[in-house]
Amino acid sequence: MNIKNLNQIPIVVEQSARGERAYDIYSRLLKERIIFLVGPIEDYMANVVVAQLLFLESENPDKDIHLYINSPGGSVSAGLAIYDTMQFIKSDISTLCIGQAASMGALLLTAGTKGKRFALPNVRCMIHQPLGGFSGQASDVDIHAQEILKVRANLNQIFKLHTGQVIKTIQKDTDRDNFMSADEATKYGLIDKVLAKR
């Protein structure tokens, strides 16, 4: 979250027996076990999301955590830090796509607890192979090319695990940008259900 946007974050004021308490909207929603994953996935954002997941698990490991996703994707390593934490903690994680879940955003959407992965009707999801770029000596370029192929194979295995698709289908479907509507994402196995209303 960019510090210069803090003045644009709404504040919620609650009344209690001890007086008033002001929360920024995201902190208030965190009290309800709702985490927002919004914007490009990068290291700072991943660290905040991981910390929120760990905090909510420590508060009550038997209660669901709700992860709302609106992301164009981003860093594979940052996304995998969130993914691994989602798989590591005891709490079930309900994922809900609002807007878009592309690239690593789509991987995190499908990584929610089976039966608890949702999208709103007008979202778009997109899966593809990881992007990479490197310049330097030929031997170093080759090392990085081999690494990106390993990363691609790993991401494909994760999609296979959560969607139920066979690996050949995942490889073909992630070869280029592959956009899906909410209904198509349901048929593919990225999500379990499209939600029109609560």
Curated annotation (Swiss-Prot):
Enzyme class: hydrolase
Top-rank taxon: Bacteria
GO biological process: protein quality control for misfolded or incompletely synthesized proteins
Keywords assigned: Cytoplasm, Hydrolase, Protease, Serine protease
Single GO MF descriptor: ATP-dependent peptidase activity
Pfam hit, one: CLP_protease
Keyword Protease attributed: yes
A GO cellular-component term linked to this record: cytoplasm
NCBIfam families: clpP (TIGR00493), PRK00277.1 (NF001368), PRK12553.1 (NF009205)
Family indicated by similarity: Belongs to the peptidase S14 family.
Name under which the protein is recorded: ATP-dependent Clp protease proteolytic subunit
Originating species: Vesicomyosocius okutanii subsp. Calyptogena okutanii (strain HA)
Gene giving rise to this polypeptide: clpP
